[in-house]
From Swiss-Prot:
<dbReference type="GO" id="GO:0102208">
    <property type="term" value="F:2-polyprenyl-6-hydroxyphenol methylase activity"/>
</dbReference>
<feature type="binding site">
    <location>
        <position position="62"/>
    </location>
    <ligand>
        <name>S-adenosyl-L-methionine</name>
    </ligand>
</feature>
<dbReference type="GO" id="GO:0010420">
    <property type="term" value="F:polyprenyldihydroxybenzoate methyltransferase activity"/>
</dbReference>
<comment type="pathway">
    <text>Cofactor biosynthesis; ubiquinone biosynthesis.</text>
</comment>
<protein>
    <recommendedName>
        <fullName>Ubiquinone biosynthesis O-methyltransferase</fullName>
        <ecNumber>2.1.1.222</ecNumber>
        <ecNumber>2.1.1.64</ecNumber>
    </recommendedName>
</protein>
<feature type="binding site">
    <location>
        <position position="127"/>
    </location>
    <ligand>
        <name>S-adenosyl-L-methionine</name>
    </ligand>
</feature>
<keyword id="KW-0489">Methyltransferase</keyword>
<comment type="similarity">
    <text>Belongs to the methyltransferase superfamily. UbiG/COQ3 family.</text>
</comment>
<keyword id="KW-0808">Transferase</keyword>
<dbReference type="GO" id="GO:0061542">
    <property type="term" value="F:3-demethylubiquinol 3-O-methyltransferase activity"/>
</dbReference>
<dbReference type="InterPro" id="IPR029063">
    <property type="entry name" value="SAM-dependent_MTases_sf"/>
</dbReference>
<feature type="binding site">
    <location>
        <position position="83"/>
    </location>
    <ligand>
        <name>S-adenosyl-L-methionine</name>
    </ligand>
</feature>
<comment type="function">
    <text>O-methyltransferase that catalyzes the 2 O-methylation steps in the ubiquinone biosynthetic pathway.</text>
</comment>
<keyword id="KW-0831">Ubiquinone biosynthesis</keyword>
<feature type="binding site">
    <location>
        <position position="42"/>
    </location>
    <ligand>
        <name>S-adenosyl-L-methionine</name>
    </ligand>
</feature>
<dbReference type="InterPro" id="IPR010233">
    <property type="entry name" value="UbiG_MeTrfase"/>
</dbReference>
<dbReference type="Pfam" id="PF13489">
    <property type="entry name" value="Methyltransf_23"/>
</dbReference>
Length: 239
């Protein structure tokens, strides 16, 4: 595992994918439309499970162009956004400036950030990022190191099975064209049991898991108990 960040836990091809379309991050009808659509659900889940965000120090790992980071800052959180993509961070900084929202954006790996700032944050979020790095377990361990005792860490990713491949790759990329082709690689998807196993190797403990569902007939997203495709996991640092 890459906890000490001796070799940066970075997939440059993955970064290039998002840098190529970063200028359209805040286009509500563009490639990131699904992220804008699900953001209220993600924000609501995080805020509820963390017992509110106001006044809390929050880190958004893999923040991209800042959709979730900005929304948490609007809730009154002191937010730092972390990403390795220069172009998405430039977009995020500009949008925050235009929106009048204070977010501190940093270009750094989560492992390096954990080395420099252990136990700094009340809440850490890592949304749709684990499936885009070579060593996702290293990210989980770094997130655990960054949060205070009693603090909250949230992960979201995609399950690895035939249904997830049909929905997240074939359906979303080829049929519905919700995201660009090549966005996802089923080999990098993560089963909930795998993620929980990584969590159990840290001081984090699972508190709740929920699925994120899309109905193409109604064009509607909702949270629910089925974790066959997209899911979010709430964990808490054992005091």
């Amino acid at each position: 595992m890459n906890v000490e960040n001796q070799t940066p836990n970075v997939d440059h091809q993955e970064i290039a994918k998002f840098e190529a379309i970063a200028s359209r991050w805040w286009d509500l009808e563009g490639e990131f439309k699904p992220l804008h659509r699900i953001n209220p659900l993600r924000l609501g889940y995080i805020s509820q499970r963390a017992e509110g965000l106001f006044g809390k120090k929050v880190l958004d790992v893999g923040c991209g162009g800042g959709i979730l980071a900005e929304s948490m800052a609007r809730e009154g959180a002191d937010v730092t956004g972390l990403d390795m993509g220069a172009e998405p961070l430039q977009v995020a900084r500009l949008h925050a400036l235009e929106s009048g929202v204070a977010v501190n954006y940093v270009q750094e790996t989560v492992e390096a950030h954990a080395q420099a700032h252990p136990g700094l944050y009340d809440v850490v979020t890592c949304m749709e990022m684990l499936e885009h790095v070579p060593d996702p377990q290293s990210v989980v361990q770094a997130c655990a190191k960054l949060v205070k005792p009693g603090g909250h860490v949230f992960f979201s990713t995609i399950n690895r099975n035939a249904k997830a491949w049909m929905m997240a790759v074939i359906g979303a990329e080829y049929v519905l064209k919700m995201v660009p082709r090549g966005t996802h690689d089923i080999k990098k998807f993560i089963r909930p049991a795998e993620l929980m196993h990584w969590v159990d190797s840290t001081p984090l403990r699972e508190k709740h898991i929920t699925g994120l569902h899309y109905n193409p007939l109604t064009d509607h997203f909702k949270l629910g108990p089925n974790v066959d495709v997209n899911y979010m996991l709430h964990t808490r640092h054992d005091k």
